[in-house]
């Protein structure tokens, strides 16, 4: 069914320009986010071709988020894992939500990769993603085959009921598109967590992260359990990407 949808969606979009997709329901998932200090000029250069600019937190500094996600029940795509490597960006339109774009968005199934790329314009690729508890600590490992890209660890925490709204910019068919995700669930957002750590491997993605990061020290963590959300149908921003 997923493959049939891929063929139909691409045929209609390529022939007519009509997006026949719908918003996607995420009925049950967990996420583990670490935040790190990042080099504003370097990320600004990486995003220049997208016509996006990182949000400057302090002079010369922005943030990088690495988010391990266990997607257990997702409409159409089914269960999968992903690791979002994302940065906050300046909004192209005024709005109340935090605004981000993905530098990389590896996933571990083709059923979750193609709609992310074709419909939402996300930079998804297939990778090995292992998220598990080990000695009472959460471990998220991202690899390409046997080659480590990154691994981060943190203490798991039970949170209280919270609701967020995050906007994301993607690039689809040489156009900027925006979508909104509205996670709600038991979320712990307590700021600095000295238990969290990051290790980078020997891979081109890891090399890029080394250039981006000012330090590998984690400055903030957010953990979400029993989360549900809707990933809104993308809308095209009224500016040319050419």
Regions found by a protein language model. Name each.
Residues 3, 10-15, 118-242:
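Interaction-surface and assembly-scaffold signal
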Residues 69-150:
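Aromatic- and glycine-enriched beta-alpha-beta binding-site module
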Residues 10, 39, 109-110, 203:
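Alpha-helix initiation/capping motif
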Residues 1-76, 80, 209-214, 219-222, ...:
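N-terminal domain-onset segments
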Residues 35-38, 89, 202:
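Short beta-strand-to-loop capping motifs
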């Amino acid at each position: 069914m997923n493959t049939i949808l891929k063929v139909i969606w691409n045929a209609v979009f390529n022939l007519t320009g009509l997006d026949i997709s719908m918003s996607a329901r995420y009925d049950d998932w967990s996420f583990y986010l670490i935040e790190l200090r990042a080099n504003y000029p370097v990320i600004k250069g990486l995003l220049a071709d997208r016509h996006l600019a990182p949000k400057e937190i302090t002079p010369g500094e922005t943030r990088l988020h690495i988010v391990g996600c266990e997607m257990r029940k997702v409409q159409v795509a089914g269960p999968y894992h992903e690791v979002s490597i994302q940065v906050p960006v300046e909004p192209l339109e005024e709005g109340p939500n935090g605004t981000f774009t993905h530098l990389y968005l590896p996933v571990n199934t083709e059923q979750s990769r193609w709609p992310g790329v074709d419909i939402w314009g996300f930079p998804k690729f297939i990778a090995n993603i292992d998220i598990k508890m080990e000695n009472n600590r959460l471990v998220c490992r991202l690899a390409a085959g046997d080659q480590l890209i990154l691994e981060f660890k943190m203490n798991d925490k039970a949170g209280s009921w919270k609701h967020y709204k995050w906007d994301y910019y993607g690039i689809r068919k040489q156009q900027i598109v925006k979508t909104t995700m509205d996670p709600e669930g038991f979320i712990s957002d307590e700021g600095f967590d000295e238990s969290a750590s990051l290790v980078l491997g020997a891979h081109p993605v890891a090399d890029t992260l080394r250039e981006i990061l000012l330090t590998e020290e984690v400055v903030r963590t957010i953990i979400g359990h029993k989360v549900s959300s809707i990933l809104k149908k993308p809308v095209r921003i009224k500016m040319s990407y050419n």
